[in-house]
Amino acid sequence: MLARIGWITSFLGVPCNGPNHWPDLGRRPSVRHPVSESSAGTSPDLNVLGQPLVVCGCQPMTGWFRDGHCRTNAADLGRHSVCCVVTEAFLRYSQAQGNDLSTPAPAYGFPGLRPGDHWCVCAPRWLEAYEDGMAPPVRLEATEDSALEVIPLALLQANAA
């Protein structure tokens, strides 16, 4: 078991010990993505407040890198940078837009989201949901500063969890 924990710790960079800790440390993440420069330790990941980025959620595991953080790189075309506390209304809205986040997809290790789960949402999708009155609350400390390229800070602050 310790070898498997070590593998995950080295794969993810740090153990996920955020508010929704991933309890099944023996299960490997189902998706691998190239490591960004910032995730390789050459520069710190910052949140929209200019502070170090904190874990968004690990139950279920979230983030482009599936390490619990809402951080991105050039390969993430969706820009999964906004840490949200998903609501029933947002899950219904997302499904109506063609992105069903509530239905489990076991083939991808995805359990489906429930209201209250913390999830990294694409910045353009969050802005679209905001414009339609359906944006979920945002955890500013866990939202990557790159989200500011799409969403004004004032909107994020007005919708802070």
Question: What residue ranges belong to the model's regions?
Answer:
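Short alpha-helix capping/helix-loop boundary micro-motifs
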Residues: 102-109
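Short, compositionally biased
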Residues: 126-149
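Extended boundary segments
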Residues: 36-89, 158
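Glycine- and charge-enriched low-complexity intrinsically disordered segments
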Residues: 146-161
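Short, basic/aromatic beta-hairpin or loop at an interaction surface
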Residues: 85-100
